[in-house]
Structures are given as C-alpha cells and as structure tokens.
Amino acid sequence: ECPMCGFEFGKDDDSQLEEFSMTEVDLLDRSPFRWMDIFGTGKCVTATGFNGFSMVIDVGELSCGLVKRSGGRIRMISIGTRKQAIASADDFLREIEDSNSAKKGRRWLNERISDKQREMLSRNGVQVSGFDFSWTKYKAACYLNYLWNKGRVDDMVNNVREKHEKR
C-alpha cells in the first residue's frame, strides 16, 4: 500500500507477463573511448587516454580487465564475462580522463602515426611501413602501451589461465 495515497499495488493484478525481451547494449559502441582490436583476433581490445589505458583480454571463457594509470602499475580489476571486463575497464578510463582530453584527443584518433612512434614500435619489433595508412597516433599509442607492459600483462593473463585450467 502506498503511504501517500493508499493505493494497493498488485491487489487486483492477476495478469501474467506473456512476453519479455532484453536488448543487448554494446558497451564498446557507447564508450566515449575508441576501443581497438590490436591483434585483429577479437581477443584483446584496448583503449587509451592521456592519463592511462585499459585492456580487455579473453582467456578461454573468461575475460580480464587490466588498467594502468600513467606513471602507475598495471593491475587487473575484473575477471568474468566480457561485458563485465569491458564495463570495469571503460569505467576506469571514464574516472581518470576528463571531458577536455576527449575533445583534444579526437584529432589524435585519426592523425597519421608520428615518426617517433614508428621508431618506438620498430625498437620493439613492430615494423610499420611508411605506406601503411592504417596506423594512426592513437593505434600506435594503444600498441605501445601493450608492448611496454607486455611482460606484466602476459604474467597476469597466464596466471588467470593456469587457475582457470585447474578447475
């Protein structure tokens, strides 16, 4: 009963719900960040900002959300479904980035890779041809974030894989 008006909820309502449908929300499309599939397999997506980056890596049936604040340590914030990992990784970026950086970053998303980024990628074993126009500053930044943290990322993912296989 409503304390304000006295209406009795559900008293005369014997009807059954006949049809119900849920719609899936594509978290990546709704994100203010551009999530990139850096290996082209769909198993590792990453997004970066000026203050940090996030990654979601599929490990068997699980997905892991990894994040790192600029100058900080990479850490795992989620192990679960892909949606859970993406939501937590995206929330992390939303918390550490401000709306001004999103505006500044739009231009950066589509600008050609810089010579400095091409050089850094090359030092890490990734050759980018001067004629490969698919490489932008943003794509290079995402890839470099992975390469610079590869050892720790691989350790964390392998740890999850080992624990999951023991089950």
Go through each PLM region and give its residues.
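Non-catalytic terminal extensions of ATP-dependent helicases
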Residues: 1-167
